[in-house]
Design a protein with these regions (language model features):
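C-terminal structural segments of small proteins and small subunits
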Residues: 66, 74-90
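Short S/T/G/P-rich N-terminal loop/turn motif that feeds into the first structured element of a domain
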Residues: 1-53, 60-70, 93-101
């Protein structure tokens, strides 16, 4: 079974309020087995536009990633983000097929 991922690009506009979102999202992330692979590290936008933060979160499955996004726990966290940040988020299924080489 393929893992699931959230890919998020975020511009934080109110850092203090955004801290509330970070605290609130921990409940949903723990429940659905989320694991941060990238969390606002150094980056270089080599093509296209970028936001100030990039986040990649891994879930045990694509369904778990969707379930987390649609959960009451994450909706409560997402509500905390309103007015604190602008985000682009996609939920994507991982790839388990053959690799080059």
């Amino acid at each position: 079974m393929s893992k699931g991922y959230w890919v998020a690009r975020v511009d934080v506009t109110d850092p203090e309020k955004y801290k509330t979102y970070i605290t609130a999202n921990a409940v949903a992330f723990a429940k659905y087995g989320a694991r941060f692979l990238v969390r606002s590290g150094a980056f270089e936008a080599v093509e296209g536009t970028a936001r100030s933060r990039n986040v990649l979160i891994e879930f045990p499955s694509y369904q778990a990633a969707l379930d987390c996004w649609n959960s009451a726990e994450y909706k409560a966290a997402r509500d905390c983000r309103v007015g604190a940040a602008t985000a682009d988020v996609i939920v994507i299924e991982g790839y388990d097929g053959p690799q080059p080489g």
